[in-house]
């Protein structure tokens, strides 16, 4: 199983360049060249680490607290802001990979889903936890990718522990520690 995962990972690294990751923002300056490059690198690394070997599309929106609050209320009926929202296209389980036949025939890409990140939460949480905004943004992107791939943390037990372990492993691959 370890050998198979490593083989899938190496193949996924080759595929990473073929992922399509549009990043948009509805707040000034959020979609800076640096933020966009970081987000794309983190998504590609997370997908490779999880063994995703088909070209995928992940759409990213950078917003503020009021923007994410509105989306949260509209899409999830939760009347609150949050740090990150993930909207997976497929109902995957952890370790289950998107299949080539899930690709959009027009683009050849598997639409994994959307992520929405509050840049105000990024700044506030970076201050709260005493680390750089770059680290907080990277963490939220990894967290969201794992949700798109079926991970969850609704329990306080094995699901959450598994997701946290994957988050830390991927951040470690990126050289981003606490």
Locate predicted features.
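An acidic/histidine-cluster motif and surrounding catalytic segment
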Residues: 2-138, 146-178
